[in-house]
UniProtKB/Swiss-Prot annotation:
NCBIfam families: rpsS_bact. It comes from Morus indica (Mulberry). The keyword Ubl conjugation does not apply. GO terms for biological process: ribosomal small subunit assembly; translation. GO terms for molecular function: rRNA binding; structural constituent of ribosome. Belongs to the universal ribosomal protein uS19 family. This is Small ribosomal subunit protein uS19c. Disulfide bonds: none annotated. Its main location: plastid. It is found in: Plastid, Chloroplast. It comes from the Eukaryota. One of its GO terms (cellular component) is chloroplast. Keywords: Chloroplast, Plastid, Ribonucleoprotein, Ribosomal protein, RNA-binding, rRNA-binding. The gene is rps19.
């Protein structure tokens, strides 16, 4: 279900503070965050944000096409390695 348009998009306060600080300094550095639920807003464009996937932080470069999506959409948490082999010997 989509968030109501009456509300602003959710962005974690610590993440918003870091983005605004880097924008005023005009610096680019990797921002480490665990906030996968934060929505990407236009002030984040051009920054690299390392999003936690449960094991490590994956660096994601924010582009204009990502605006409106959540940070967690770009850091997959599951790593599918294929189905188990059909081992008939173990069925005995």
């Amino acid at each position: 279900m989509a968030r109501s348009l009456k509300k602003n998009p959710f962005v974690a306060n610590h993440l918003l503070r870091k983005i605004n600080m880097l924008n005023t300094k005009a610096e680019k550095e990797i921002i480490v965050t665990w906030s996968r639920a934060s929505t990407i807003i236009p002030t984040m464009i051009g920054h690299t944000i390392a999003v936690h996937n449960g094991k490590e932080h994956l660096p994601i470069y924010i582009t204009d096409r990502m605006v409106g999506h959540k940070l967690g959409e770009f850091a997959p948490t599951l790593n599918f390695r294929g189905h188990a082999k059909n081992d008939n010997r173990s069925r005995r």
